[in-house]
């Protein structure tokens, strides 16, 4: 993993832990559905997506929410959006 991807991963996991403090980031698998791994309800998930927007300045349209299933999906999405700047 390159340094930019590692930093992005750490930032995303820190945000996730701020919303769900019981989450152990060391056990999050990149390919499994994130909401199931950390048992986020719909409000927590929405707070997570809003937090991504605020932290990274990336607009996430509601139509894209369904694409953001796993941690890997979230990271790929953010990385692509950040590279478009």
Region locations from a protein language model:
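Phosphopantetheine-dependent thiolation modules in NRPS/PKS and related acyl-activating systems
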Residues: 2-40, 44-50, 54-85
